[in-house]
């Protein structure tokens, strides 16, 4: 697909697998989505998303392969798409992202943006760029916001994954990952 770029040093396709997982959409309807992930992480990710689904406490707007967005991380984030594999470097570097190995998942990027100072990505995530705003939006009933004490963070951490919302120099609220190498 369009998210696999051998010229960038992507891992072999045989190290990746298509995973179908359950989730509740923003209207609360049960549905399924697709994530391309590392074979080595597939079982634990299936368990994590099943735990989140079973809690019925967290909602995801959409979950489609990044190929649908031409392999563009920006287009996928702007569509508030939850995704995993995308062979790309860490923004602003030449180092491959954990996404390039199928070892990272971004969930509801609009409600859970990347934030460094006044920079917010995607831009539509600006109403959710600070913890007080995030908590207020959740209190108003906005679905899909990842908070430290919530079901999504608990499920990922319980299964050995880390959360970008815990970082101190910047926040990546959408980002859950395993160490790549």
Which residue ranges define each predicted feature?
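Active-site-adjacent loop/helix surface patches within enzyme catalytic domains
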Residues: 59-101, 109-114
